[in-house]
Amino acid sequence: MVTIEEMGRLLDDIADSFPEELFNELSGGIVLVPELKLNPMSVNSDLYILGEYHRGFNSGKYIIIYYGSFMKVYGYLEEKELRERLEHTLKHEFIHHLESLAGERGLEKEDAKNLFDYIMLRDWKGRK
């Protein structure tokens, strides 16, 4: 299992590989927290939040990565595969950031649709 310190180094390596322009107006940067975060819409406690993009008037713009959620979902993976999942999540959150700067909400809508599909599938499976 990758420790939070090791994951922090992986996250730094990934972020360092991104173009500097992506970080424009990301005043709070990327924050790795130890918590596990369950999606409030989770059915049977099986949907975890891996990362979140925050934009607030007082707190600025920043990305949170949840170490505990990553370990719950991907803790069995080797470091290389975990790094790929981490990079995918970070790119996803950066798309939210860039869309926010552009006044777009395409990925937010896609995330909402995916959550709706998840809920409907879980509901359908529960009725079988």
Predicted regions and their residues:
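Amphipathic alpha-helical interface segments used for dimerization/assembly
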Residues: A15, L90, F94-E99
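Auxiliary, metal-adjacent structural segments of Zn-dependent hydrolase domains
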Residues: D12-S69
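Mid-chain, well-packed structural core segment of small domains
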Residues: G51-L90, F94
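Long, hydrophobic, amphipathic alpha-helical segments used as structural scaffolds
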Residues: L22, L26, L98-R105
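Generic alpha-helix signal with a bias toward terminal, lower-confidence helices
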Residues: I30, P34, L38, S42-S45, ...
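N-terminal small/polar-rich segments of proteins
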Residues: M1-I14
